[in-house]
Amino acid sequence: IIRIVKFCEIIIMFVGGAGLVLAWLGFAVHFLAIPLMMLALWFGTFDIARRTLFAKGLPRYMAVCLLAGYAWLAVAGLAWMGVALGCPGRDLALHALGLGFIVSMVMGHAPVILPAVLRLKLLFGPWFYAPLLALHASLLLRVVVGVWEPALRAIGAQLNAVALLLFAI
């Protein structure tokens, strides 16, 4: 019960922070950053993905996707905190949240959701990791190396698109 209450408190902080950000972008970004980091910590602590990481096959793939997504969620929170303190990092925050966290969640849940919704049978194999690896490698290239070299940022962005196409195939 305490876990659920804490989770609800974090969600309320996140929704409140999002509302404040919409009203006062420059001032209230840290009200969004802190709940993002808290959510990443909560998920990383209580999600079953920590245990299924040591399984085999599809459960392990899903755990890798989820845990990588939680790491990007923490990065997004840290980046938004930096933005609140006046550091440049909006691009990092948006891409860590949008591509790193959200797309990782989509990739991790798709093998269960798509067959249920579309009535398609997906055969899991090691190739499932290719789009995931491409996504995270290209995102690192885009937001870490790309800070110092704009050409590499552009290449990272193009490789992000390739990763999404690989996933769609």
Positions of predicted regions on the chain:
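Hydrophobic membrane-spanning alpha-helices of multi-pass integral membrane proteins
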Residues: 11-18, 66-74, 99-102, 128-142
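Juxtamembrane membrane-water interface segments of multi-pass membrane proteins
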Residues: 1-7, 22-26, 42-64, 77-94, ...
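Small-residue packing motifs within transmembrane alpha-helices
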Residues: 12-15, 29, 36, 59, ...
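Small-residue-rich transmembrane alpha-helices that serve as helix-helix interface/gating elements
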Residues: 32-38, 97-99, 152-169
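Long hydrophobic alpha-helical segments that form multi-pass transmembrane helix bundles
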Residues: 1-18, 32-34
